[in-house]
From Swiss-Prot:
Organism of derivation: Delftia acidovorans (strain DSM 14801 / SPH-1)
PANTHER family: RIBOSOMAL PROTEIN S12 METHYLTHIOTRANSFERASE RIMO (PTHR43837), RIBOSOMAL PROTEIN US12 METHYLTHIOTRANSFERASE RIMO (PTHR43837:SF1)
Protein's UniProt keywords contain Iron: yes
Protein name: Ribosomal protein uS12 methylthiotransferase RimO
Encoding gene (name): rimO
Taxonomic lineage: Bacteria, Pseudomonadati, Pseudomonadota, Betaproteobacteria, Burkholderiales
InterPro entries given in the database record: Elp3/MiaA/NifB-like_rSAM, Methylthiotransferase, Methylthiotransferase_CS, Methylthiotransferase_N, Methylthiotransferase_N_sf, NA-bd_OB-fold, Ribosomal_uS12_MeSTrfase_RimO, rSAM
């Protein structure tokens, strides 16, 4: 496996051979932000990154442990790094997972790793690095401040970035082990979040993706206390955070996109603000299922029976609203009737972008004890049926875009044709949604620049994507 891109290459004092660190980041955007913090701190202390395991003095692997496939990938990557380098520090969600004998899983499988930490453990990782690869001393580099709360090294393209507003989760969904690895909800101080956001916009970010385990619950742990930003009071709450982010983004013409938003009644307050256009009318809402009995077995928060009603009300207020969601098919005990209820919900809710997992037992999850585990072939068959309906809904909604003029953020400068491009509209988050394939501009001299916004008339569809002609 190739370590993280050399976009993170760090400067070294003249004449000094700086120690080199290989880095691999696995898992979700929340893990990616942890990686960015570690890499920023490494840079601040004068370490360099290596493109290869062999060329590094040691390797850091940031792991994922949410589902079995992710566990296997993480363990395989650690093994590869050990084979090619021999000195490996492990961090991330898998680092907090116990093995069969009650000890640490990673140390049971790979006892030669140098150190293991859980997620969101920048200082612990740095302590391990200092132990096994002492940092170079430089009087100028040593004055660089710490990275937390500031915009440091980013692993995303320059024009978009993830902004993590909290760590952990207060829910105990039966299929999930994240709280056991990342702990209960801890909201970042609102002033730190806003400071990082402004630094990102100043650095050229055109799209800010707000992430957490539960964005809607931001501030619950601190009882929505009032913080300060630019000398003004700002409540530690999702609505006030989003309003202030929009205010900061406006001079830069940048987008603000919300992810992991649970359908609490408090989200109703955000929708009118989305209708003004100051924040993208896009919500990533993890519904997981629609049937009340399945939701109870899942121990999902919020009132699932009213989700359809809530969605319809949101779209009445904000007709341009796009909903992305993820679901689980074949959860233990799911009957055919309950699954049909889910398919009907998908049709009626008109979910723009839907993903689905066939239920897979996760070691340590309470759902493993629920009676009625379905055969794998039934779970996979239901996932396939779900995705067929999801594609029908998505295709119909995409077709309605034909003839519209949309703002597109350019991700690639070469696409369909010699001077075409690829970008995304407000309806598409990076990596998980569709694209807008931009046809070559009518003026031969005009080209697309990554990170620019262009207006495009939608002239067709292409699978999950749109095709646009610049105007």
């Amino acid at each position: 496996m190739t370590p993280t891109s050399d976009a993170t290459t760090m400067t070294t004092p003249a004449g000094a051979a700086a120690p080199r660190v290989g880095f691999v980041s696995l898992g979700c955007p929340k893990a990616l932000t942890d990686s960015e913090l570690i890499l920023t701190q490494l840079s601040a202390e004068g370490y360099q990154t290596s493109k290869t395991f062999e060329g590094a003095d040691l390797v850091i692997v940031n792991t994922c442990g949410f589902i079995d496939d992710a566990v296997r990938e993480s363990l395989d990557t650690i093994g590869e790094a050990l084979a090619e380098n021999g000195k490996v520090i492990v961090t991330g969600c898998l680092g907090a997972k116990a093995g069969k004998d009650g000890g640490n899983l990673i140390q049971e499988v790979h006892p030669s790793v140098l150190a293991v930490t859980g997620p969101h453990a920048t200082q612990e990782v740095m302590n391990a690095v200092h132990t096994h690869l002492p940092k170079p001393h430089d009087p100028f580099i040593d004055l660089v401040p710490g990275a937390f709360g500031e915009a440091g090294i980013k692993l995303t393209p320059r024009h978009y970035a993830y902004l993590k507003i909290s760590e952990g989760c207060n829910h105990r969904c039966t299929f999930c082990i994240i709280p056991s690895m990342r702990g209960d909800l801890v909201s970042r101080p609102v002033g730190d979040v806003l400071k990082e956001a402004r630094a990102l916009f100043e650095g050229g970010v055109k799209e800010l993706l707000v992430i957490s385990q539960d964005t809607s619950a931001y501030g619950v742990d601190v009882k929505y206390r009032t913080g300060f930003w630019d000398g003004k009071p700002v409540k530690t709450r999702m609505l006030e955070l989003v309003q202030t982010l929009a205010e900061i983004a406006e001079p830069y013409g940048a987008w603000v996109r919300l992810h992991y938003v649970y359908p609490y009644p408090s989200v109703d307050e955000i929708i009118p603000f989305m209708a003004t256009g100051r924040v993208l009318p896009y919500l990533d809402v993890p519904f997981q299922h629609s049937h009340p009995d399945v939701l109870k077995r899942m121990k999902r928060p919020a009132n699932g029976e009213r989700n359809l009603e809530r969605l319809q009300r949101w779209r009445e207020i904000c007709p341009d609203l796009v909903i992305r969601s993820t679901f689980i098919a074949g959860f233990p005990g799911e009957t055919e009737q309950e699954f049909e209820h889910l398919l009907q919900f998908l049709r009626e809710a008109q979910i723009d972008r839907a993903g689905c997992f066939a239920y897979s037992p996760v070691e340590g999850a309470a759902a493993n004890e629920i009676p009625g585990m379905l055969p794998l072939e039934v779970r996979e068959e239901r996932r396939a049926r779900f995705m067929a309906v999801a594609e029908e809904v998505s295709t119909a909604r995409l077709q309605k875009r034909v003839g519209q003029t949309m703002q597109v953020l350019v991700d690639k400068s070469v696409g369909l044709g010699k001077k075409g491009g690829v970008g995304r509209s407000y309806a598409d988050a990076p990596e998980i949604d569709g694209l807008v394939h931009l046809l070559p501009p009518e003026k031969a001299s005009k080209t697309y620049k990554v990170g620019d916004f262009v207006k495009a008339r939608i002239v067709g569809t292409q699978g999950h994507d749109l095709v646009g002609q610049p105007v």
